[in-house]
Amino acid sequence: TDTKVWGFQLGGTSAVTEKISAGARASFYDWDNVSADPDFADDSERFGNLPTAFEKDARIGESTVFAKWSGIERWPAVVFGTVAYNFTADSGFVNGARVDPDQFAWGYGVEVGDAKQLFLLGIVYSHIPANSVLALYTDSDMFDGYTNREGFGIYVARELAANTEFKLSFWEGEPIKTTASGDGDGPYNPTEYESAAHKANRKRPQADVNFKF
């Protein structure tokens, strides 16, 4: 059958004090028959996912928590953390090497300011193991859609007009695992794939104009 995906999400925000609020979000995604289309989900190690990431289906949970301080009108501050877990990933052998499930991802960050008032400044850190999420469906800005990577990003944003935002970012990432054990090059960052984004450290400045509808 064709690949399908369904999901649900629940979240909310509550005032803790007059100037502090907190919130949380929980999501669950079920990818049915994800292995039916290699263009939809690739577990060949080329983009980070290993053959142990999923067999037929993929079930991934995600949760984010945050707290916001609004003590200064033009300089609110938000701290946040997020986790993701692939319930279908497993340990096993890939290319003759023993591999862990590599199924738990996490990240955190802080934002200060308001793009509509003066500007927004943010910094984030993410740790995305090989099988924690579906490669190519993860953060494309930070890691180009690859898994088995960790790194940070810093960005500044300013609203130019209603629903139009200019954003400057700098992203730096590197592989989490680079084992060369087993037959050939092992399961992580195999050299037969000539992808600099997958194998090498990445340092990338980026400029975006975002339109909101």
Where in the sequence are the language-model features?
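Short, solvent-exposed loop/turn segments at secondary-structure junctions
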Residues: 31
